[in-house]
A protein has these predicted regions:
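A short, acidic, amphipathic alpha-helical segment used as a generic capping/interface helix at domain edges
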Residues: 342-354
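Metal-dependent polysaccharide deacetylase catalytic core of the NodB/CE4 family, i.e.
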Residues: 138, 142-144, 150, 154-158, ...
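Short, composition-biased local secondary-structure segments
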Residues: 182-199, 275-293, 346-349
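Histidine/acidic-residue-rich catalytic or RNA/ligand-binding cores of hydrolases
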Residues: 277-280, 339-343, 371-376, 402-403
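Terminal accessory/targeting
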Residues: 2-5, 15-17, 22-30, 37-208, ...
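Alpha-helical, coiled-coil/dimerization segments enriched in small aliphatic residues
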Residues: 211-212
Length: 439
């Protein structure tokens, strides 16, 4: 006898309801996966294999050739991005909404910086005319960017496509930060003229920064500080108060002073967390400043490095009262993300040095990548004509130069740039704490 199962009206209805639920869940999962894929694509870190560049940077002129090439590649991608609609740009950056006012502000700043860098890089065109084109102003630079193309039979042909990919990804990094600013603060823009970024340095001048330390004894911090002394250069180590106290407790104040001998030590707060939406952000900075000045009076520099670049838009007066300056950066190694290798980190930094020609280079002394990347940079740039800034005179040198340039009859005590007139003035900085430590 064959037994047949027939669904009752109730069971059939329940089945259809479950069918709809499962279908909705599958659609939701699919949408999430697509969103994650889009975010992963737009969130790719810009890297490049420097071996595709055919010449060692063994003279200042060859540094300039590579610099001019990188400037043109990036300028071409910047120009191309301006042809995108707001919707297309949002999709490319993986964002729902864009702050186009800040995006356009940053684009204009980028053009101005690229033009300044081009004028510096073209000084050696008589010695080597590679990538030399006539550029008298920003509109002409935009025209050259539109015309830019590396011929298939060029000596530099292997470099062209990887360079364009790097430039587009790096531009995405900058425009994404711009699109979120000032709601989410970052290093892409300053809130006032007291804040530093590294753009203030002279051409071919760079300062190494190591942050998030110190490590436990005999860790990466020790290795890097020793290496700096061996190379007869110095760097600014931005320390976390909690880690500094732990290092003191496990060793001694004398050992700490030996660790940072000849180096500079700035502040990064008590913990590595956003100082934009932490109720205890002021106490975090004050506690770290007090401890650092007590333990390392000869190394202390009055600079605060905000974790993730996050700080409050209304914090300027606090920092003035504390006699501190916010120190941002313009060359991010991305070594703290855990997503690129030490070699990729080194190649990325060198490429950005060619593009920006000056600035603060940020590494983390809590990872082992800087131990490989920094020596590689030193070796590959030894004859390039660059110089490493002395951390002891930065930014005091800038302050002295500003005092010399100021009008003699200027007696106003009002702080400059309470809020910059050329950028959005409100910041809620509502972003959640980043999931990864690093810039």
């Amino acid at each position: 006898m064959q037994i047949r199962y027939s669904a009752s009206p109730v069971s059939a209805s329940l089945f259809k309801d479950w069918e709809h639920v499962v279908l909705r869940m599958l659609l939701l999962i699919g949408a999430c996966l697509l969103g994650l894929n889009a975010q992963a694509a737009t969130g790719d870190i810009a890297t490049i294999d420097r071996s595709v560049w055919p010449e060692a940077l063994e003279t200042p002129q060859l540094f300039d050739v590579a610099s001019r090439a990188q400037i043109l590649s990036f300028a071409h991608q910047l120009l191309e991005s301006e042809n995108l609609s707001d919707i297309q740009l949002a999709d490319r950056l993986g964002l729902r909404q864009l702050n186009m006012a800040t995006v356009n502000l940053i684009r204009n700043r980028l053009w101005a910086r690229l033009f300044d860098n081009w004028k510096a890089a073209e000084q050696s065109c008589e010695a080597d005319a590679s990538f030399c084109v006539l550029v008298d102003d920003v509109p002409m630079l935009r025209q050259r960017a539109a015309e830019y193309k590396v011929a298939d039979d060029s000596f530099y042909a292997r470099w062209a496509a990887p360079a364009d990919a790097f430039s587009q990804r790096y531009l995405n990094e900058l425009l994404r930060m711009a699109a979120l600013f000032p709601q989410t603060s970052s290093e892409v823009e300053r809130y006032n003229s007291d804040e530093l970024s590294g753009d203030e340095m002279p051409d071919r001048t760079f300062l190494l920064n190591f942050e998030s330390g110190p490590t436990a004894a005999d860790g990466a911090t020790d290795w890097l500080a020793d290496f700096m002394r061996q190379q007869k250069i110095n760097a600014t180590f931005f320390v976390l108060g909690k880690s500094l106290q732990s290092r003191i407790d496990s060793t001694s104040p004398q050992a700490l002073q030996t660790l940072y001998r000849q180096q500079c030590v700035g502040l990064q707060g008590w913990e590595y967390r956003s100082h934009a939406h932490w109720n205890g952000w002021q106490d975090s900075i004050e506690r770290t400043a007090t401890l650092t000045q007590q333990m390392l009076p000869d190394n202390f520099v009055p600079l605060f490095r905000p974790p993730y670049g996050h700080r409050r838009a209304d914090s300027a007066q606090f920092f003035r009262d504390q006699q501190l300056r916010v120190s941002l950066w313009n060359i991010d190694s991305q070594d703290g993300t855990g997503r690129i290798s030490a070699e990729q980190t080194a190649h990325r930094v060198l490429t950005l040095m060619l593009l920006w020609r000056r600035g603060n280079i940020v590494f983390h002394d809590t990872t082992d990548k800087a131990q490989q990347a920094v020596p590689w940079l030193m070796a590959n740039l030894a004859q390039s004509g660059i110089s490493w800034e002395d951390c002891h005179i930065y930014p005091q040198q800038l302050s002295d130069e500003a005092d010399q340039d100021a009008p003699e009859d200027e007696d106003s005590d009002e702080p400059e740039d309470q809020q910059r007139a050329d950028q959005p003035q409100q910041s809620t900085d509502q972003a959640e704490e980043p999931g990864e430590q690093g810039e």
